[in-house]
UniProtKB/Swiss-Prot annotation:
It comes from Pan troglodytes (Chimpanzee). InterPro entries: Exonuclease_RNaseT/DNA_pol3 (IPR013520), REX1-like_exo (IPR034922), REXO1-like_dom (IPR031736), REXO1/3/4-like (IPR047021), RNaseH-like_sf (IPR012337), RNaseH_sf (IPR036397). This is Exonuclease GOR. The keyword Ubl conjugation does not apply. It is an enzyme of class 3 (hydrolase). It is found in: Cytoplasm; Nucleus.
Length: 690
């Protein structure tokens, strides 16, 4: 039978506890032993140990927050039974823990390669952290020694050998956590629609690139982030798949970086204006393409020189410009009967297939003559060529010597009203691709179809504007003069919507003609894709007038650069070359360049190599025309006169050819010199290397 020898084995208030305590006090040493706790448990649970002191000490352990409370009388383990003697022996040599003068405000536990911060606690006990290797119990104890109250003291942690372990306890001041500011925590939100194949990681990468480029020209970081987010959203909305998204974002990034120059590098505005004059439309081209001209008799009127198709005989009958159906209208222009309009918004395109060519609509791939794939509430008409009143004409302006008339790109958007197409938006871009004027316009008549698929104008855009067509005309007349170059694609439709008469225009539809010729025209979208590598007019929200105007301007700049590359460069000739452009050998039979365009190289051969094979062959056929070079401006060395060497450097070469020993052939008397025939009948000349 085991005998209880420690007071802690009995429950609080048990009678035997006092008796055991008295027996233990007699066997205890004369000096008190401090409390000791092993530092490391080597993976095994080790309970708290308390050495016996001279006075009775009652220690109660507080239960942990996690898990149930531990019963004080749990049975001993093998490790505990073997570990007690060793701990008692080492505890006798340990000094007492120092007393703290003030209450610790924070505790930080430092471990090898790891630091962990302990939270503040309002409890009077010391708060320690729990690691993966061991658990430290939180305990509070009170001890009275020599009639004074002893404060709670944290004990030093030691290992088995009596040395301090690597885990130390440091008491520091109150730690202030630095938190980032609110603007840095705000991140752009990328919205994602269902069914899209563009990864979000790819979108974030290009959004970051857009932001970096926008920071170079935006006033603030917030403005740059908003602009970059809008650019990425536009590219994402018009991209059904990943490949299309990559094409759009690359074009957008190229535009933001400014890789596509807005004007010719190193070329002034006046020089650019002079270069664009060769691409202007002539009077015949203006009439052929339907540009308005001032009416000779009626002020404010316009006249068109294109053949107009004959409409229905009844003045109240109109023809729908979308489906081709005839419908009746009232005096106000409204439809008499409510009829649905079934139409195809795409064009008819012919493609090559096995066995021939097939014509299909680009919108739904249906055959011509099929029922339309789109439905509108009523029929509409164009009507711009029916009302030719209210036109204004640009006038000449006096400019200073350093000024030039100006170069602008123009694009307009229109909606269907009761009287046909009317202006709802106008955008003007200068030669630097900067938007100088952009506004929505309120039509004079009631809108029946906003045509948002192509115009990009909505009901909300028109509702918030009060600008009318006469106000727009006044502003444009202040910008333009009669000499100002206006650039656009099918610009006659824009001028008819603006009711503006201007003849100094550059039309990209004429500058880049269709391979079938007039009246076929290539679309601006195809031209931008073929020549600029850009995808435009691909948004579901409709066209953007500023985007179309910039595309027209870039196409014209591309044409100017191409013309500058293929144009021959005129090099200035040296004085020696101008004095003697064609060096010749002295000969009595040679014909001077002034009397004949024949090359002196051939005449030099005849004088110096008369006995040669070639000289003999030429003399045997006196009716054969003498060869001349392709370009009469070229000299004997095959170069232009400005690049020919001097006469002294060419004469030794001719002399060396003339001193070669002739072949043994019979001599033939030389033919008398004759006049050189027309240069067009001359064959290709022989080279000196032959």
């Amino acid at each position: 039978m085991l005998r209880a020898t420690a007071p802690c084995w009995f429950p609080p208030g048990y009678p035997e506890a006092k008796k055991v305590a008295e027996e233990a006090a007699l066997e205890a040493p004369e000096f008190p032993l401090p409390s000791h706790q092993p530092a490391q448990s080597f993976g095994l649970p080790v309970p708290q140990m308390h050495n016996q002191a001279s006075a009775f000490v009652d220690i109660q352990a507080e239960p942990q927050n996690r898990g149930p409370a531990v019963h004080p009388a749990w049975p001993k383990m093998v490790t505990e039974a073997c570990y007690f003697p060793a701990q008692r022996g080492s505890a006798c040599c340990l000094p007492a823990a120092p007393r703290l003068t003030e209450r610790p405000s924070g505790v930080r536990i430092s471990a090898p390669r790891k630091r962990k911060t302990i939270a503040q606690s309002s409890s009077p006990c010391l708060v320690t952290g729990c690691t993966d290797a061991k658990r430290t119990r939180v305990a509070s104890s009170s001890q009275r020694s020599s009639g004074s109250k002893v404060g709670r003291q944290p004990g030093k942690t030691r290992n088995r050998s009596g040395m301090a372990c690597k885990t130390t306890t440091t008491i520091s001041s109150k730690r202030i956590v630095r938190r980032p500011s609110l603007p840095s925590l705000k991140k752009p939100i990328i919205l994602r629609r269902s069914g899209c194949q563009v990864p979000t990681v790819l979108r974030r990468g290009y959004l970051q690139l857009f932001t970096e480029e926008c920071l170079k020209f935006c006033a603030s970081k917030q403005e740059a982030e908003e602009k970059a987010l809008n650019e990425e959203k536009v590219a994402y909305d018009c991209s059904p798949n990943k490949n299309r998204y990559l094409n759009v974002v690359l074009n957008t990034l190229k535009r933001l970086k400014g890789l596509t120059p807005s004007s010719m590098p190193g070329l002034s505005r006046a020089a650019l204006y002079s270069r664009l004059q060769e691409f202007l439309l002539s009077q015949d081209q203006l009439k052929e393409n339907g540009y308005p001209f001032p009416h000779p008799e009626r002020p404010g009127g316009a006249v068109l020189f294109t053949g107009q198709g004959k409409g229905p005989g009844d003045s109240s009958c109109r023809v729908c410009c979308r489906c081709g159906t005839e419908y009746l209208v009232s005096s106000s222009g409204r439809c008499v009967r409510d009829q649905l309009c079934y139409y195809h918004w795409g064009r008819v395109r012919s493609s090559q297939v096995a066995g021939g060519r097939v014509s299909q609509y680009t919108c739904c791939a249906a055959a011509p003559g099929s029922v339309g794939c789109q439905v509108a509430k009523q029929h509409v008409r164009d009507g711009r060529k029916d009302s030719l009143d209210g036109f204004v004409e640009t006038f000449k302006k006096e400019l200073s010597r350093d000024a030039y008339p100006g170069i602008y790109a123009l694009d307009c958007e229109m909606c269907y009203t009761t009287h046909g197409l009317e202006l709802t938006r106008v955008t003007v871009v200068d030669a630097d691709m900067r938007v100088v004027y952009d506004t929505f316009v309120k039509p004079d008549n009631e809108i029946v179809d906003y045509n948002t698929r192509f115009s990009g104008v909505t009901e909300a855009d028109v509702a918030k504007t009060s600008i009318t067509l006469p106000q727009v005309q006044a502003i444009l007349l202040s910008f333009f003069s009669a000499q100002t170059i206006l650039i656009g694609h099918s610009l006659e439709s824009d001028l008819l919507a603006l009711k503006l008469i201007h003849s100094t225009v550059l039309d990209t539809a004429v500058l880049f003609p269709h391979y079938l010729g007039f009246p076929y025209k290539r679309s601006l979208r195809n031209l931008a894709a073929d020549y600029l590598g850009q995808i435009i007019q691909d948004s579901q929200d409709g066209h953007n007038s500023s985007e179309d105007a910039n595309a027209c301007l870039q196409l014209v700049m591309w044409k100017v650069r191409q013309r500058a590359q293929i144009q021959p460069r005129h090099r200035s000739a040296s004085p020696a070359a101008l004095a003697c452009p064609w060096p010749q050998a002295p000969s009595t039979t040679a014909i001077s360049p002034e009397s004949s365009p024949c090359p002196p190289r051939r005449k030099a051969k005849e004088t110096g190599a008369v006995d040669g094979r070639r000289g003999q062959k030429a003399k045997s056929n006196p009716n054969r025309p003498l060869p001349v070079p392709r370009n009469p401006c070229r000299g004997p060395s095959g170069l232009s006169p400005s690049l020919c060497p001097s006469q002294t450097s060419v004469l030794p070469l001719i002399a060396s050819r003339s001193t070669e020993p002739p072949l043994p052939v019979p001599r033939v008397p030389a033919a008398p010199p004759r006049a050189c025939p027309h240069p067009s009948a001359h064959p290709r000349p022989l080279s000196l290397h032959h």
